[in-house]
Amino acid sequence: MSGLFLVGAAGATSASQAAPADEERAEPVVVGHRGAPGYRPEHTLASYELAYRQGADWVDVDLVPTKDGQLVARHENEIGGTTDVAAHPEFASRKTTKVIDGVPLTGWFTEDFTLAELKTLRATERIPDIRPDNKIYNGRWQIATYQEVLDLTKRLGRELHRTLGTYPEIKHSTYFASIGNPTEPKLVDLLGRNGLNKRNAPVIIQSFEVANLKALSKQVKVPLVQLTSATGAPADFVASGDKRTYADLATPAGLKEISTYADFLGPEKAQIIPRTAAGTLGTPTTLVKDAHDAGLKVVPYTFRNENSFLPTNLRSSADPSDWGNAFAELDAFLATGIDGLFADQPDTALVAVRS
C-alpha cells in the first residue's frame, strides 16, 4: 500500500494537522478513474480489474442508489449514455425528465429501477467517437454493485499480493436525500458489513458536496476527499442559499475549513495548472502549496491520453481519438508536488510517476 493512503488514514482523526515533512512524502498514487476506461467501458468489473492489473492500487467508484436501496457503480444516475437501456422496450416507459442538481436531464435513472432490473442491462462505451476500440466490449458486462467491486478488490489483492483499495464517490447527495433515498447511510452500512469502517482500511470517500462530508467525518474512520471544480459551486451550497463557490473553497481560508473534516483535496486539474486562451498549459497556481500548508493531500482529476483532452500543443494530430504527448502533461503536474492523480489510462500514469 502506498504511503499516500497511510498518511491520509492517520489524518482522518486530525485532518487539520500540519502537512508531513518532505522526507515522509510517498510516491504519487495513481487512481484508476472509473477503472481503466481508456481500455474498457467505465465502471465495469472488467475496467476495475484491468486498472488493478496495470498496477493501480486504487480505483475510483462513483456510487448511485437503486430503487431498492442498493449502491451501484455509475458516474451519474442517468444511464442512457452508458448502458443499452434504450434497446429494452420493457423499460421504454421509464424514460423521463428530472432536474438533477439544477440541471434538467432526460433519460433513464437508477432510482427508478430495482437492482434486478438493472442487472438485465449491459454497459456500453460512453465516448465511442473518442474510444472506438472500446465499442467491441459493448454488451459484455453488467452494471456492478459496490459490493461486487469490493469483492473483486479483495480477490485481486490476494492474487496480486498487494493491498488494493477503492475511492467511492457519493454522487448527487442532496438530490438523493431530497427523494428519500440517501446514499450515505447505505455506504456507511456497507463499509461496516465489510469490516472497512476502521482506520487504515483501504477506502477513501469522496464528494463534490460539503455537508455530507462534514457529517461523514463523525461517522466513519476512513479518510475523506473534498472534490472541487474549476467552475460552479457545491450542489448543497446552491440548495441552501450559500453563495460560496468552489473557487472560495480553494482559497487558503477555504482549504483551512476543508481540513477540519477532510484529509484530501481532489481538484479539477485546471485549478492547479490552468490552460491559456490558446489551450496550452499556463502558469501553475499556488493551490498545491496552499493545500499542503492546510494539511491536505492533493489528488487532481482527470488525466487522459487522447488528443481530445490534452493541451493543444501536446496533441499528436487532428484526430481527437489519437494519443498525444500525455507524458508531458503528466510530468508538468507531477512537478507541482501533487500527491496522486486520477487517470483513465493508469498504466501510462504509472510510467510517468515511476520514470
Label each region the model flagged.
Residues F5-S355:
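Phosphate-group recognition and catalysis centered on beta-loop-alpha active-site segments
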